[in-house]
Amino acid sequence: MCGLTYLCVNPTFLTMATFLNFTLKELCASDIAKKQNIDNFPSFTIAKNLEELTEKLLQPLRTAWNDPIRVNSGYRSKALNDAVKGVQNSVHQDGFAADLYPSNGKIDEFGMFVKDWVTKNNIAFDQLLFEQSGSSKWVHFSLYSSTGTQRRQIHNITVK
């Protein structure tokens, strides 16, 4: 399903997964990291976690949805997670979560689709959170919890 290209950066070898619809670059992109000059490049282990997240959740979801999905937030280094005021044990830091938004802008329809898709297809995951902050909405989708479990939690969350 994916091809791997190994990159040598500051003698650490990192994996670059190329899936049909997602890239490592996209999963690590952050405007806040750019603005605050925060290094948000993952280790080899975290890149492999992002690959697993993509292979098991993101790409199958994108294929089922059959329309582009934007990753608003994927991997976050500890410094970036602190900058965005993420929870201390956020699995974004481990490469096991992504905040998603459908490119067509139909976030409520997308949220219902994801909920139905995980239920009907018995998809293994940790959390499916429908998050909102003011008028902004997104879907948080994680593969594992910080303890490695898959709790299959589905919640609505208001972020302050």
Description of each model-found segment:
Residues 88-109:
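Acidic, His- and aromatic-enriched active-site or binding-groove loops in soluble protein domains
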Residues 72-73, 91-92, 127-133:
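Short beta-strand
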Residues 12, 102-160:
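Catalytic cores and adjacent binding grooves of peptidoglycan-active enzymes
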Residues 6-62, 151, 155-160:
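Extracytoplasmic cell-surface/polysaccharide-interacting catalytic and binding patches
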Residues 70-72, 97-101, 140-142:
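Structural recognition of the beta-strand scaffold that forms the well-ordered cores
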Residues 55-85:
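Extended, low-complexity, intrinsically disordered C-terminal regulatory tails
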Residues 76, 91, 141:
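Single, functionally critical "micro-switch" positions that shape active/binding sites
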